[in-house]
A protein has these predicted regions:
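Conserved, mostly hydrophobic/aromatic
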Residues: 28, 36, 52, 72, ...
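Aromatic/hydrophobic pocket-lining residues that form the small-molecule binding cavity
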Residues: 52, 85, 115, 154, ...
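Canonical Radical SAM [4Fe-4S] cluster-binding loop centered on the CxxxCxxC motif
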Residues: 7-54
Length: 297
């Protein structure tokens, strides 16, 4: 549920479907990634305290004892000053006695503006989970898609979150480097995962969105996307090179609308079974004679 008064779409992870969506910002502070059109045309704005309080009051009025989870929207709530975030978290704890978890998207530049201690304070105040779109660990690909950070910074952002004790749900995008950069993208992303050690890992497939620069590049013949089987081969190379400690449990999912195949595993325990599932998927997808290169679902 959500109670904001804006007419722009609200985006949230699938696992936040039953959460109270509390909009604390509008749009995305970066809003320059070439593959994304989520907030194009939406001026970035930090909502006033009065508007945030109004949403919380309405949610408390209609479901004070029902709210278990809260998701802070829009694209990068962590851009807020730490003091303001801590105040919001305090109010949420006061208003919702059965609150179990607060979560948010987090952009790498916003994470890097926070110290480990600040992240730890927010975790203790109730911000238990961050959804982090690292997308890739590869320098060249990050630069090409205008992510705003390099590989070292992308890794440090993720590492800082896990070091604070927060849960980290990290997202990567299969096919982001195109056919030419696929192997490099896969290997560097696996290296990043090994350093960060996320608690959750989601592999999405590239979608060429209307209004994105990457779509323009494809239509101009400057970007060569992977086939569905090629996307699975890239995922196989990533999984083959993930080397997590036996006592570190990472929940892997590929259940986004962009995925051709839904996969689930706990790494490193299920690594070999996951690789067998991927091999089967490659064999089946290789039979496709045509597919929607835009990956519109």
């Amino acid at each position: 549920m959500f109670f904001d008064s804006y007419d722009t779409p609200v985006f949230r992870p699938p696992s936040e479907a039953r959460s109270f969506i509390l909009r604390v910002t509008r749009g995305c502070a970066h809003n320059k990634c070439t593959y994304c059109n989520m907030y194009r045309g939406v001026p970035f704005q930090i909502l006033k305290d009065e508007e945030i309080s109004r949403q919380i009051a309405l949610a408390a009025h209609y479901g004070k004892n029902k709210v278990r989870r809260v998701f802070l929207a829009d694209g990068d709530a962590l851009v807020l000053p730490t003091a303001k975030l801590l105040k919001i978290l305090q109010v949420l704890r006061e208003q919702f006695p059965h609150l179990q978890r607060v979560a948010s998207y987090a952009a790498p530049k916003d994470i890097l503006r926070k110290s480990e201690e600040e992240l730890r304070q927010m975790k203790e105040a109730g911000l238990k989970l961050l959804y982090y779109g690292m997308e890739t660990g590869d320098d060249a690909t990050l630069k090409a898609v205008n992510k705003g950070v390099d590989g070292e910074q992308a890794v440090e952002a993720g590492r800082r979150v896990t070091a604070s004790g927060m849960k980290l749900s990290m997202m990567i995008i299969l096919g982001l480097a195109g056919a030419e950069g696929s192997e490099r993208h896969a290997l560097e992303t696996a290296k990043a995962i090994n350093i960060i050690k996320p608690t959750h890992l989601s592999a999405l497939c590239l979608m060429l969105y209307r209004g994105s620069e990457l779509l323009d590049q494809y239509e101009a013949g400057k970007f060569n996307p992977l086939s569905p089987a090629g996307l699975m081969r890239e995922l196989k190379l990533i999984i083959e090179n993930i080397d997590l400690p036996a006592d570190r449990h990472c929940l892997f999912r590929s259940n986004h609308v962009s995925n051709y195949v839904q996969l689930a595993a706990t790494l490193p325990h299920d690594k070999q079974r996951l690789l067998r599932d991927i091999d089967y998927s490659i064999a089946q997808l290789s039979k496709l004679k045509s597919w929607d290169v835009y990956n519109y679902n």
